[in-house]
Amino acid sequence: MPSLLITILLLNIVIYVINTIGAATIDSLLWLFYIKLPTGTSHMAREQRRLKREVIQLKREMNATSSQDEFAKWAKLRRRHDKALETYEAKNNELTQCKSSFDMTVKSVRWAATSGLMLFLQFWYSKRPIFTLPPGWIPWQVQWVLSFPRAPMGTVSIQIWGGACATVVALVGDAVGATMGFVSASKKEGMKVGAGVGEKEGKKSQ
C-alpha cells in the first residue's frame, strides 16, 4: 500500500521538524500570525500595545516632573498613569487568557494531526502489511519481528515501518544539521582568516 507507506514517512518528517524547531517556537509564530488577522483578538492586541505605550509615556513624564516644584502637574500625571496602568493590566490579562486558549487549541490540533493520526493509523492498519518481503529472503525469526504485532508473516507491519522511518529521518536530519553547522563554521573561519591577512598586509604597507 504505497499511499500508507508514504503517509507514515511524511508524518515522521513533520514530527521531526516540529520537534527540531520546537513546539513553543511554532506556537509563538502562529500566535503572531493570528493576531495580525482581522479578528477581535487582533483588535485587543493592538489596544494592549497602545495602552502599554501610553503607560510608558506617562511614566516618563512623571519622572521628568518634580513632585515638589510642580506637584499639581505631577499629581495629575500620577492619576492618569495609575488609571492607564489599571486598564492596561486588565487588557493584558484578557489577552493572556486568549493566548492560553489559542495555545491549547493549537497543541490539540497539532497532536491530532501528527501523533494522534500516527496512533490511529497504527491501530487501524495493524493487520495490513506495508509491503511484502521476498519468500525465503530472511529467516523466519526476523520475519516475525518485522511483521510484529499483527501483520501477516513475511511482511512489514506499519509499526515496524513507522519505527524505521523515525530512525532514518532522525539520522538524516542530524546529518544535515551537522553538515550545515560545519559549513557555517568553515565560512566564519575563512572570513576571520581573510580579515587577519588583510590587517597584516595593511600593516606592511604602512
UniProtKB/Swiss-Prot annotation:
Compartments it resides in: Endoplasmic reticulum membrane
Assembly and interaction partners: Interacts with GET3.
Listed Pfam families: CHD5 (PF04420)
Family: Belongs to the WRB/GET1 family.
Gene3D superfamilies (alphabetical): Helix hairpin bin
Residue ranges of the TM segments: 5-24, 111-131, 156-172
GO cellular component: endoplasmic reticulum membrane; GET complex
Record keywords: Coiled coil, Endoplasmic reticulum, Membrane, Transmembrane, Transmembrane helix, Transport
Stretches assigned to the Lumenal side: 1-4, 132-155
Segments forming a coiled coil: 42-99
Cytoplasmic topological segments: 25-110, 173-206
Name of encoding gene: GET1
Name of the molecule in the record: Protein GET1
Membrane topology annotation: Multi-pass membrane protein
GO MF annotations, alphabetized: protein-membrane adaptor activity
Function: Required for the post-translational delivery of tail-anchored (TA) proteins to the endoplasmic reticulum. Acts as a membrane receptor for soluble GET3, which recognizes and selectively binds the transmembrane domain of TA proteins in the cytosol.
A single GO BP: tail-anchored membrane protein insertion into ER membrane
